[in-house]
Swiss-Prot record:
Its main location: membrane. One of its GO terms (cellular component) is synaptic vesicle membrane. It comes from Homo sapiens. Residues 18-169 form the MARVEL domain. This is Synaptogyrin-4. Keywords: Membrane, Transmembrane, Transmembrane helix. It is a multi-pass membrane protein.
Amino acid sequence: MHIPKSLQELANSEAVQFLRRPKTITRVFEGVFSLIVFSSLLTDGYQNKMESPQLHCILNSNSVACSFAVGAGFLAFLSCLAFLVLDTQETRIAGTRFKTAFQLLDFILAVLWAVVWFMGFCFLANQWQHSPPKEFLLGSSSAQAAIAFTFFSILVWIFQAYLAFQDLRNDAPVPYKRFLDEGGMVLTTLPLPSANSPVNMPTTGPNSLSYASSALSPCLTAPKSPRLAMMPDN
């Protein structure tokens, strides 16, 4: 194991450079927010009422709301861990097709998670709004924390989708280059000559004239005729 000898060498190491990437920082925030959402409702999300020992969800006694938050938070946390592991191997991926497929999968999942967290935020906030006040002695702070970090998860997943889209644009497969021109995606390639394309070739023969010969100066193309000298008669 290599131990850095100075702070400059530590800052230039691969591990630090990997942690400083915007994609890595975003994934860390996604994992932390997901962990807060599902742990808050998993520990304090189920409480019993004063007149009954049976546990109920603190979000309007709707067990679906608590189950949704716990399940979505846990799956999102696992997704962040899996993509962090794949990001560490991104530089070792040699195949262009596999790398493009990985980036496309990252973009699709980021968009899906942004939609899931948006729907979850609306659902949890609605259930909390219809919850009777002071029905449960504990758990109100956990419910508010889960709803707040559900909203924050929407923002980080949208930013993750934006980063994945930028990677797709910058790492387009060769020989294609993708440019965003006034909202439209343009694909440009270098044209290759085909067998049916007309090619101007000089023809040979006694009756053929080339462009180069026609472009010569009149002095070279039209030689002067010899002059006849008149001799005096003695």
